Amino acid sequence: MQIRNVLIVGGGTAGWMTATALVKLCPHIKTSLIESKDQPIIGVGESTLGQINDFFALLDLTDEEWMKETGSTYKSNIRFTDFYKKGETWDYPFGKSTIVNDLPHGWMSWFALNIEKPEKFTRDTFARSMNIIGHLAYANKLTRCDKFPFDHDTAYHMDAVKFGQWLRDNRCQEVDHMYGEITGCVKDEHGNIDVLYARNKELKYDLYIDCTGFISVLLEGLMKVPFKSFHVNEGGCLLNDTAVTCHMPH
């Protein structure tokens, strides 16, 4: 079946990121999006990893375009305070280490120095051995060098709600944007959604994408696809299902 038109259900960050990707990469496909005016958007001040830069590269999206408008900041690594010992920290580094003789130089440098001077090159110095940006972060600075590889050495802290709205307003002008509540569907002979209903309005598309988050209007609600938990008590591998957010000294 040739996909000629797509309906995205849900207008949060995931919905508008999906719409942006379709507009950019599949301009021959007619993209539509329907969202509820009454359903709040999930957003807790998202923290990303460096892999998000691959997505931005697909969209030809530059930091100068969106960061200021969305209240975003750069993120250079993840620090675990009191992680393995009270008063000690461990940093999870971002970026690509320098390659020497087909080996990641940052890793090898740290292990060699750790053996030679274990009292100085402790575990909390690992990130700074991987990449120069660790040194900058400890000095509370970030380079202004135009050639610095921000595309893989950094990630972002962002207001996800504002980011989704920015994509909507700046990258999705071609999207047919609607408001409404999905109330039902008609399925085809294979059990797939053929037609959606938004109250009394009929919506028929070649492909439907569920971006409704935890509510899962299409997958769980209409298709009855069971939610698969990663919690260890339910056969998964996730030991922790709770997070406490707080400000650390910085």
Task: Give each language-model segment a name.
Residues 4-29:
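N-terminal Rossmann-like FAD-binding beta1-loop-alpha1 element of flavoenzymes
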Residues 13, 26, 34, 58-63, ...:
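Terminal, non-catalytic protein-protein interaction segments that mediate quaternary/complex assembly
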Residues 13-14, 38-39, 49, 183-185, ...:
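Short, solvent-exposed loop/turn segments at secondary-structure junctions
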Residues 23-44:
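Glycine-rich FAD pyrophosphate-binding loop
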Residues 32-36, 143-152:
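A short, surface-exposed helix-loop junction/capping segment
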Residues 44-136:
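Dinucleotide-binding Rossmann-like beta1-alpha1 core, especially the glycine-rich loop
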Residues 148-250:
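Predominantly flavin-linked oxidoreductase catalytic cores and closely associated redox partners
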